[in-house]
Structures are given as C-alpha cells and as structure tokens.
C-alpha cells in the first residue's frame, strides 16, 4: 500500500511533468514517513534500497541528438566503430536505433538497448553510456549493410575482395544516416471496463514507438517510429506485429495493457536524419520537419499550391492517342509502387477540376504566364482522353465523373471543347428528377445520394453562369433548395463543400433566375446557415498542441469522434472544411467584413496542416523515387499513401484560400478609392 503512495509521488517520464531531484532517491518516499511509522517505514526504505540506483549523468535532451548523429556519421564514413572512444553518460535513455540508406533504400539497420530497460519505465532509469549504445547499433548496422552488399556484389559478379572493398567504401561515403534515441518509456494502462479498441487512443502513430512484453515470450519487442513511418505500418498492424512476436494473435487485441495480458509501453525519440547528400542533417518529429511558425504567409501558400499542382501534373503520362494523356493511380512510397496503374475516371475528373480551378486563378493574376497556359493545356489533354467515360450510355457509375468534368471545362484559361461541355451539361440536366433529386438511372425513380446530388448541383450552377441558360439556373436552384433543406436537420461535410461551391459561384444569379417568389429570402437564409456551419467547423479545428502527441496536428480538423484523451488524428479530409471556410470568406453575405479575422486565422492554420501532410525530400528520407512523391498530400500524418483525391481536394481548398485573399485585397483597394 505504501509502495503505491511512493510511486505516485515519483512522476513518470518527463512527458508527464518535471522530475524531482534524482540524486537523493529516498526523498521521493519521504511523504510516507508522515503517514505511517514503525516497521512500515523500514519496509518502504528496504524497497527503495532494492531499486536500481539512478545515475549522476545529465538527462538526455534534444541538444544531445545532433552530436550523437555526427558521431555515428563519422563512424559510418570510416566504415568502422573505434574500440577506444569517449563515454557519454546520460540518464533517460533506454536504447537507440541506427539505419543506413542508399537513395531511400534500407541497406543496414542496428539497434542497442540498455540491459536494464525495465528500470527506465515510468522513470529516468539508470545511467547509460549513450556513445556505447550508439557504437553497438552502428556496428550492427554496418555489419548488416556489409552482408546485404556482399550478396548484391556476388549477384553482380563483383564478389572479388578488391572489388567488394571498393563497393563498400563507395557506400560508406554516400550512406544516408538515420539515428533515433529512445526516451520517455511510459506504461500504457487500461481499466478493465475500457472498450476493446481503447488501446488505439493511447499512442500517436508514427510519433510514439511501442514496446511490448508478455508472459508467453522471454523478451520484449520494440517498434521504432522511423521504421514504422518508412514501412507505412498502420496502428493496427503495429499491434499485430507485437502480438505475433509475443505469442498472441490479433484476436487478443483486447488483452493489451490489461491485467494478465501483454503489457505495452510507448516511448518518444530524438530523431535526426540526413535525407540526401545535399541537405543538412535535421531533427524530425513524426518523421516531419517541425514547422516553427503557427501560420503560413501568402508566399509560402503560393509555394505550397505550386508544389501540389506540380505533383498532380507529373501524375499524367502520354496516352497512345496523340494530344491525350492518362493519369496514374495511387502511389505507395513505401513500396515504390503505383497500384492500380491508372486512376479511376472519377478521380481523374476531380483532379482536372482542381487543376483548372488553379490555372484559372493563375491566369487572372498573370494572363501571360506561359507555364500556366501549358499546364491548362495538359489538363485539356487529360479531359480529351477521359471524355468518353464521362458521357452517358456507359454501364459504369459515371455521375460524378460527368459532373467534375463539366466543372473542369467551365474553368481554366484555354479554349475548351464546347460541344463536349454542352453534352456533359445536358447529361447532368437529364439526371434531374421532376419530383426532386437526381436519377441514378435514366427513366427510373432510384435517387442518387445527397453527396452526389451536391456535386451535380455545383456543376449545374457553373454551367448556368457559363451558358446563361435559365434551364440550368432553375435546376441548380431546385437542387440547392433540396440540399439546404436536408442539411438543416442533418448537415454533412461533403454536401456543404459543393453547396458552398454552387452558392459562391452563382448564388445571386440562381435566385434571380428562379420562379420562386421567396428566392431572395431563401438565399439569405442559405447564407446564414453556411455562416453558422462555418463557425461550427472552425470550432472543430485543432488550434493548440494536444496533451498526447506532437503539435503537427495543429490546423487539422477533428471530423470523427475519438476516445477521450486520445491523440487527435486529422487526415487529408481537413481540406474539405478548409474549402468551405475559404468559400464563405469570399462572400460578405456569409462572413461579414468585420468578422474576417477568425476565418483568416483558421485558413492559415489549415494551410499549415496541409503543408505538414506534404511529402518532400526532408520527410521522405525513405523515398526511392522522389519525383513520384514530391508535393503529394499524404492520407494522414502516419499513412504516406498518395491517393489522387488527397492532393486534388487540397489544391481546391488552397486555391479557394488564395481567391479569398484576392477578394479581401480587392475590397481593401475599393475602400481606398
């Protein structure tokens, strides 16, 4: 009983608070002397004396990581670890991992743990020679690399000793070093009544490493964050691996961190990587370069938009037919693989809309920009290649393809295929059901989903502006009325993205073309509703560092429920509320001029989060094909899969942010005249 009291007085790792003076171990149990007396005090003191003594070395800190990295890199360049070396006594460290890569490919890996790792759980632990651990891990990584390169040399008929030695020396000179120093080993404990999946709320994927022990295996197993990110290992797969190694299976997931089951600890790392020979070694947080500024400025925003647009541009490839282009499917950086080989037509159509929206905004700023014109022409070639998939008459579900392709053709600085645009517009108009909604199949009563109806309505609104045809305006207005009616009671994020798009592009024109005598009043009501929803979305944005996990989530939006206390896990879908806020900011009927500062702040934070999702050379230290990945928006901060939708929706949101800033600047200039 009194031992528990003593342990409570001793805070765990520094992630939970300041540690007391560890030079006098007995002081942390002194409060027990005031609670009990006699033999219980003697018992407590005996327990304390039986615990391993804490060292006198300094506690590991972020500043220690860079010298450690430089030490390892010198050893790697020399191809050997010296026997005689200085010691670096530290407390708080329990282990290290060293990885050697060549152009993103893992060539060698080594780890080293202190023999008393268990004594570092929930406390600083004993003194450790950091250089000693680094030496063991580096030597192991070099041996691993030598074995792998030896096998490769034999396959290439370069196995003769003198040739192999040259191969090794060349590798040592260019090897990219990745060093992780583990600290803050913290127990994960779940109450018996916790939900079966509660364990997923106890660690931030890709930021925390994991260690598991259990009664079925003699040794603990660890997963290090850098390797987790490089392999694109999901949280569930991480736990599955640990369970398998401990003699369990995935069905035993509810046993983790409970009495009698496998025990779990999470830990943090100081992570230093040299991502390329031409870059300095940098500290990374969750494999990412930590952004110091809370917001991004307009120049950084422009650069971010350009990188995403360039990434989408390189997703295209020549088609067999002249003046047409295909689009690659999702890229999986961890496997250096495109799978499936080609994107779905719906994904391609959304990309075309995003790119044309971007090109249109660039053209408005600089009509003579030749690079922008060429980019728009490239998108037009993609549209020509996929036009048949967007036209009616095919068996596949092509409603969204038709709508997004129409929206793409109604933007952009190049001459479009008017006949194709009109055919697509007629196809969308024909989907309208006379009793409301949109038909799934011509001549049948089956209605399309709300989300699809919202996209079709946005497409009709755009066509109403471009064609000046009242039939499209009336159909778009009816679609808006239906969508606002259902969203009043049950708002859906996807609906609001495209409703905002339709209203922002053509709201006043649609109301004017309507036969509804209450159209103006309804339009005001729609804007008031979007104003309210915009505020609610901003309230769901992460604006400060979480209690558990890093601050790379700041700017993202919490769009799904999670267990209390769990680290936030925003995804690329944060681009959707970002687009809604940006569209609302462009309309003074939704966000009044004296209320723009909050939304601008939210947009700046949101753009910062999208920037954190971006794959670059720095956070893509494991990339084997940078050109395929650079500028792509990841699925999440721990899932590097580059789906086309992630980058397309992010480009739409950020382009609307740029347009919102353009509109605010226009208002400022107008007020000065």
Located regions from the model:
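Well-ordered alpha-helical scaffold segments within catalytic/enzyme domains
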Residues: 287-298, 349-369, 403-417, 455-468, ...
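Extended, well-ordered alpha-helical scaffold segments
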Residues: 294-312, 365-390, 415-431, 468-486, ...
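Low-complexity, Ser/Thr/Pro/Gly-enriched N-terminal "stalk/linker" regions
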Residues: 280-347, 422-429, 433, 541-545, ...
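Bacterial N-terminal signal peptides
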Residues: 36-48
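Basic nucleic-acid-binding interfaces
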Residues: 57-279
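CBM-like carbohydrate-recognition segments
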Residues: 343, 539-553, 562-578, 587-673
């Amino acid at each position: 009983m009194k031992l528990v009291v003593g342990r409570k007085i001793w805070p765990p790792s520094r992630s939970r608070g300041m540690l007391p003076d560890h030079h006098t171990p007995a002081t942390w149990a002194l409060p027990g002397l005031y609670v009990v007396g006699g033999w219980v005090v003697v018992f407590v003191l005996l327990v304390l004396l039986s615990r391993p003594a804490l060292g006198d070395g300094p506690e590991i800190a972020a500043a220690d990581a860079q010298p450690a990295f430089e030490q390892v890199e010198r050893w790697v360049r020399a191809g050997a670890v010296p026997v005689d070396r200085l010691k670096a006594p530290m407390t708080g460290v329990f282990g290290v991992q060293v990885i050697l890569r060549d152009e993103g490919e893992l060539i060698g890996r080594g780890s080293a743990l202190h023999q008393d790792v268990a004594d570092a759980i929930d406390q600083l632990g004993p003194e450790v020679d950091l250089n000693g651990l680094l030496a063991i891990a580096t030597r192991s990584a070099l041996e691993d690399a030598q074995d792998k390169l030896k096998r490769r040399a034999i396959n290439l008929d370069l196995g003769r000793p003198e040739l192999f030695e040259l191969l090794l020396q060349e590798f040592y000179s260019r090897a990219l070093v990745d060093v992780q120093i583990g600290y803050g080993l913290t127990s994960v404990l779940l109450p018996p009544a916790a939900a079966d999946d509660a364990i997923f709320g106890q660690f931030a994927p890709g930021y925390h490493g994991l260690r598991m022990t259990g009664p079925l295996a003699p040794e603990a197993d660890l997963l290090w964050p850098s390797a987790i990110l490089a392999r694109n290992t999901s949280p569930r797969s991480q736990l599955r691996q640990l369970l398998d190694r401990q003699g369990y299976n995935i069905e035993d997931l509810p046993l983790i961190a409970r009495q009698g089951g496998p025990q779990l600890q999470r830990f943090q790392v100081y992570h230093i990587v040299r991502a390329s020979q031409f870059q300095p070694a940098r500290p990374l947080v969750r494999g990412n370069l930590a952004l110091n500024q809370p917001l991004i400025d307009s120049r950084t925003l422009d650069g971010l938009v350009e990188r995403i647009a360039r990434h989408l541009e390189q997703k295209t490839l020549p088609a067999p037919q002249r003046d047409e282009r295909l689009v690659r499917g999702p890229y999986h950086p961890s496997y250096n693989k495109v799978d499936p080989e080609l994107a779905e037509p719906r994904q391609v159509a959304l990309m075309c809309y995003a790119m044309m929206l971007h090109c249109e905004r660039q053209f408005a700023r600089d009509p003579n920009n030749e690079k922008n014109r060429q980019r728009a022409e490239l998108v037009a070639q993609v549209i020509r290649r996929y036009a048949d998939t967007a036209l009616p008459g095919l068996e596949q579900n092509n409603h969204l393809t038709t709508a997004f392709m129409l929206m793409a053709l109604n933007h952009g600085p190049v001459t479009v295929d008017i006949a194709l645009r009109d055919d697509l517009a007629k196809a969308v108009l024909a989907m309208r059901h006379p009793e409301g909604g949109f038909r799934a199949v011509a001549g049948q009563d089956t209605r399309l989903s709300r989300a699809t109806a919202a996209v079709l309505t946005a497409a009709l609104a755009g066509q109403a502006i471009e064609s000046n045809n009242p039939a499209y305006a009336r159909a778009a207005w009816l679609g808006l009325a239906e969508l606002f009616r259902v969203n009043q009671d049950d708002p859906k994020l996807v609906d609001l993205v495209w409703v905002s798009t339709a209203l922002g592009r053509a709201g006043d024109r649609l109301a004017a073309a309507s036969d509804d005598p209450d159209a103006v009043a309804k339009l005001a009501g729609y804007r008031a509703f979007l104003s309210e929803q915009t505020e609610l979305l901003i309230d769901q944005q992460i604006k400060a560092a979480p209690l558990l996990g890093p601050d790379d989530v700041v700017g993202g939006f919490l769009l799904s429920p999670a267990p209390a206390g769990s680290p936030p896990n925003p995804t690329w879908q944060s681009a959707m509320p970002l687009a809604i806020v940006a569209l609302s900011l462009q309309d003074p009927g939704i966000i009044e001029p004296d209320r723009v500062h909050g939304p601008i702040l939210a947009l700046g934070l949101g753009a910062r989060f999208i920037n954190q999702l971006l794959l670059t050379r720095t956070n893509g230290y494991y990339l084997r094909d940078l050109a395929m990945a650079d500028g792509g928006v990841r699925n999440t901060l721990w899932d590097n899969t580059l789906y086309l939708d992630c980058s397309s929706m992010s480009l739409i949101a950020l382009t609307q942010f740029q347009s919102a800033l353009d509109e605010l600047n226009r208002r400022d200039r107008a007020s000065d005249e």
